[in-house]
């Protein structure tokens, strides 16, 4: 009986830890999402009209992705379909390709940051649900053991 009471106590502690960690993950994930969004919005980038979501402010993952895609299209059009690596070292269009590549990499980094922050929020929700389930099971087992 004492061993069961100890395991129920441990289950309760673990469930509370899971729920606290879950809440922290949700807060941190949401904060990161908001920070990335605010940083992008502060750049005043507007998606090119000829892109998906044209005319929208880049402050979220979808507009950032659309802008990165159209930058690739414009860079390739400007360089005659050649990438940075394919252009001669002395070709003045190499700078265009390089700038396009850097801009795309920056936008894709923000898209990844949005994705990771949403993943952290989702995992936080999962931690809370597992904690609640564990707490519920520990309570039921304790009630059954006491009967």
Show which residues each predicted segment covers.
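N-terminal extramembrane/targeting module of integral membrane proteins
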Residues: 1-48, 147
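Juxtamembrane interface at the cytosolic side of transmembrane helices
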Residues: 2-15, 113-147
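Extracytoplasmic/periplasmic regions of membrane proteins
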Residues: 34-110
């Amino acid at each position: 009986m004492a061993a069961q009471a100890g395991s129920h106590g441990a289950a309760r502690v673990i469930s509370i830890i899971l729920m606290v960690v879950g809440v922290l993950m949700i807060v941190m994930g949401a904060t990161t999402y908001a920070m990335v969004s605010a940083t992008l919005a502060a750049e005043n980038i507007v998606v090119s009209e000829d892109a998906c979501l044209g005319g929208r402010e880049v402050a979220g993952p979808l507009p950032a992705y659309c802008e990165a895609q159209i930058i690739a299209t414009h860079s390739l059009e400007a360089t005659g379909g050649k990438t940075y690596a394919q252009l001669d070292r002395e070709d003045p269009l190499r700078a265009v390709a390089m700038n396009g590549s850097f801009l795309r990499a920056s936008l894709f980094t923000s898209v990844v940051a949005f994705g990771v922050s949403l993943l952290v929020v989702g995992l936080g929700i999962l931690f809370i649900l597992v904690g609640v389930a564990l707490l519920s099971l520990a309570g039921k087992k304790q009630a059954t053991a006491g009967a």
